Each structure stands twice: as C-alpha cells, then as structure tokens.
Amino acid sequence: FWLLNVLFPPHTTPKAELSNHTRPVILVPGCLGNPDVVNWMCYRFTIWLDLNMFLPLGVDVPGFGKTYSVEYLDNSKAAPYDWRLEPSQQEEYYLKISLGAPWGGSDLHFEEGWYDLLAGLPAPGVEVYCLYGVGLPTPRXYIFDXGFPYXDPVQQQPVHLLPLPGTQHLNMVFSXQTLEXINAILLG
C-alpha cells in the first residue's frame, strides 16, 4: 500500500464534486467472524472512490476459526520454534509448551486433559444447525462415545445435523451444498 501512496499521494487523488444527486458510497467489509484483526479496508481506502461514509463491520461467529494469515500476526510464520534465535529471545515458545500447545498434551501423555474444561458446559439454548462434511478420508479418526465429554448436554430447542457428502472442511464455505442448506434454513 505504501507504493500507492507514493504513486498517488492523497492530496493528488481526484475527488468527485458533491451535489444533491450524489449518492453516498457505503462499504461494509467483513472478515468472516474474526474479531482479532482489523479488515485492511479499515485503514486503506481505494484510490478511485471518494467515500462519503465508511462502516467497518466485524461479525463474531464463535467456533468458525481464525481467518487471518499467520504472516500478519506471527513473525515466525507459525513455526513453533525458530532455531535462528537464542532461547532467551523465544519466551513465548516455552509459554506455549506449558499451556500444552501446539502438542495438545501428547508430550506429557495427557491428551485427555481438556475434558475437564468441558465438564458442565451448558447447552446454547437456541435452535442449532450443524453442517459438516462426510465421506472423505482423514488422517485421523475421532470416535466419540455416548458420554462425551461426560454426558451430552440436553436442551429443549432442536439440534439439526446436516451432513454434506464429499465436502472438505475448509472448502465448505465455497460449496453449493452449503449455500443450499443455508438458504433452506433461512428461507424455510
């Protein structure tokens, strides 16, 4: 973006004359439920628009996952340990070890340690739709018994499980099956 500022400094950007017939331009950027990173549109506008109003929008979608690229937040590019630095420069690495990430407790032979965090977790209390992909091989298989983590939470509102055959997890948002299922849910 700095190159655009050099080539097209803000004071040389042509602006449209405002009149009563000029309709306002309202941009609403969203980041798929990621509240941690500001959308790039929040601090850089396009050079060919004279914006009258700008509304950055962050929609929090719990459980959707993080949508940012690790290059923006992590100088080590998501590598847990950078061998080029001395250990005293990587205190975060040792903190991650103490919290169990990124190995999930397998280095301590305590993979089930997170079960205690889910004990007594209340049901959400709203009608729930769960869309998930099936029918593709995965590197690991998780088999949950009827007592996961201790007992299934019970709620009065229905919980709908909608399998999507042949849909990969990360491609689910681009799948036509997913959009059809969402339309059926929203439109009835």
Curated annotation (Swiss-Prot):
Protein name: Phosphatidylcholine-sterol acyltransferase
Similarity section: Belongs to the AB hydrolase superfamily. Lipase family.
Signal peptide: none
EC number: 2.3.1.43, 3.1.1.47
A Pfam family per the record: LCAT
One of the GO BP terms on file: lipid metabolic process
Gene Ontology CC, one term: extracellular space
Lineage, top ranks: Eukaryota, Metazoa, Chordata, Craniata, Vertebrata
Primary residence: secreted
A single GO molecular function term of this UniProt record: platelet-activating factor acetyltransferase activity
Domain of life the protein comes from: Eukaryota
Tissue occurrence: Detected in blood plasma (at protein level).
Keyword Transcription regulation carried by entry: no
Glycosylated residues in this chain: 20
Reactions mediated catalytically: a sterol + a 1,2-diacyl-sn-glycero-3-phosphocholine = a sterol ester + a 1-acyl-sn-glycero-3-phosphocholine; a 1-O-alkyl-2-acetyl-sn-glycero-3-phosphocholine + H2O = a 1-O-alkyl-sn-glycero-3-phosphocholine + acetate + H(+); a 1-hexadecanoyl-2-acyl-sn-glycero-3-phosphocholine + (24S)-hydroxycholesterol = (24S)-24-hydroxycholesterol ester + 1-hexadecanoyl-sn-glycero-3-phosphocholine; (24S)-hydroxycholesterol + 1-hexadecanoyl-2-(9Z,12Z-octadecadienoyl)-sn-glycero-3-phosphocholine = (24S)-hydroxycholesterol 3-linoleoate + 1-hexadecanoyl-sn-glycero-3-phosphocholine
Originating organism: Sus scrofa
Keyword set includes Transferase: yes
Keywords, alphabetical: Acyltransferase, Cholesterol metabolism, Glycoprotein, Hydrolase, Lipid metabolism, Secreted, Steroid metabolism, Sterol metabolism, Transferase
